[in-house]
From Swiss-Prot:
Binds 1 pyridoxal phosphate per subunit. It is found in: Cytoplasm. PROSITE patterns: AA_TRANSFER_CLASS_5 (PS00595). The lineage of its organism: Bacteria, Pseudomonadati, Pseudomonadota, Betaproteobacteria, Burkholderiales. This is Phosphoserine aminotransferase. The gene is serC. Its EC number is 2.6.1.52. Its cofactor is pyridoxal 5'-phosphate. It comes from Polaromonas naphthalenivorans (strain CJ2). Its main location: cytoplasm. It catalyses: O-phospho-L-serine + 2-oxoglutarate = 3-phosphooxypyruvate + L-glutamate; 4-(phosphooxy)-L-threonine + 2-oxoglutarate = (R)-3-hydroxy-2-oxo-4-phosphooxybutanoate + L-glutamate.
Length: 368
């Protein structure tokens, strides 16, 4: 059976190899007689799965040893509270608001610390990014929060900001939920990174947190123990029962990522090349069209989430119906911005983008 191409923004498509391996191991993982879903999280079988997943993620992302990797629950939305509960010390936090997700983040953080919006792209309707040189950063801020890829508006920081160069000693907190593992990360610029797995790493249910060790141990007294980073780190993410099956699928995805090759590049470097090629193909098709529009500035277009509008919005339902008939699924844009959105995460093959581009051209010719 040929599977359709799923352009969902998340939960998103998973590598077919991963799904097939999980299916083969569903009833009996490696001769254990158990499904992973049935295992004790403290048994040797699951401990092996967890340790391999953590080691593979560290290797893939080239995460230095002075960072802890935590497998948590609650998704990126919960991290909007968990981060200030752990590292704000009840003080100041600066936020760069570039779309829906960073806006949600700053609103949530206000419950726990003094929030300042250091920069925003609201005047451009979230279609550009405020240059770092214009950010109004406070010298005594506990941290600076940036969403490095806005899933809804389709804007992405092509490089991480260098806070030290901007005169700030605050740790940079990045929400990389929707582009984690799509490109390398310069960890010298980062204090803490978090991301839900359900876009690029696995199913919903597990949240990856990468936190510098010096940021541990400063949680507010009201922080729930299950969300205290130091407690989670000290217990190897097993303080409470972790989302075992989601961690298992994420681990299979890490192994799949390690196998990726693009020329001489492997792993995340190969994935970045692959993602750049997919994004270029789709943006070129939109830009050379007379029917479709992408309003995001070219210097900050997301490689993962490509929103676009039809100039004649009365054709939207026809477009979506035709796409579904061709096996191109979940292209409807977010309700807050309308139009269409193609999410082309790591697991989306080039063939999927080629099929979408072919349909874009076919639909335009039909309705020219």
């Amino acid at each position: 059976m040929t599977r359709p191409f799923n352009f969902s923004a998340g939960p998103a498509n998973l590598p077919e190899e991963v799904l097939r391996q999980a299916a083969a191991e569903m009833l009996d993982w490696h001769g254990s007689g158990m499904s992973v879903m049935e295992m004790s999280h403290r048994g040797k079988e699951f401990i092996s799965i967890y340790e391999h997943a953590e080691a593979d993620f560290r290797e893939l992302m080239e995460i230095p040893e002075h960072f802890k990797i935590l497998f948590m629950q609650g998704g990126g939305l919960a991290e909007n509270a968990i981060v200030p509960l752990n590292i704000s010390r009840g003080g100041l936090a600066d936020f760069v608001v570039t779309g829906s997700w960073s806006d949600k983040s700053q609103k949530e953080a206000r419950k726990y610390c003094d929030v300042q919006i250091a920069a925003t792209n609201e005047s451009s309707a979230h279609t550009s990014l405020p240059p770092p040189a214009t950010w109004q950063l406070r010298r005594d801020a506990s941290y600076v929060h940036v969403c490095t890829n806005e899933t809804i508006h389709g804007v992405e920081f092509q490089e991480l900001p260098d806070l030290k160069a901007l005169g700030s000693d605050a740790p940079l907190v990045i929400d990389f939920s929707s582009h984690v593992a799509s490109r390398p990360v310069d960890w010298s610029k980062v204090g803490l990174a978090f991301g839900g797995a359900q876009k690029n790493l696995g199913p919903a249910g597990v949240t990856l947190v990468v936190v510098r060790e010096d940021l541990l141990g400063h949680a507010l007294a009201v922080c729930p123990s299950a969300f205290n980073y130091k407690t989670v780190a000290d217990n190897d993410s097993m303080y409470n029962t972790p989302p075992t099956y989601a961690i298992y699928i994420a681990g299979l995805t890490f192994q799949w990522l390690k196998r990726q090759k693009e020329g001489e590049a492997t792993g995340i470097a190969a994935m970045e090349k692959h993602n750049l090629a997919k994004a270029k193909l789709l943006y070129d098709a939109i830009d050379h069209s007379g029917l479709y529009i992408n309003k995001v500035s070219k210097d900050c277009r997301s490689r993962m989430n490509v929103p676009f509008l039809l100039r004649d919005e009365s054709r939207n339902e026809d477009f979506l119906a035709g796409a579904k008939a061709r096996g191109l699924l979940q292209l409807k844009g977010h309700k807050s911005v309308g139009g269409m959105r193609a999410s082309i995460y790591n697991a989306m093959p080039l063939a999927g983008v080629e099929a979408l581009v072919s349909y874009l051209q076919e639909f335009e010719q039909k309705h020219a």
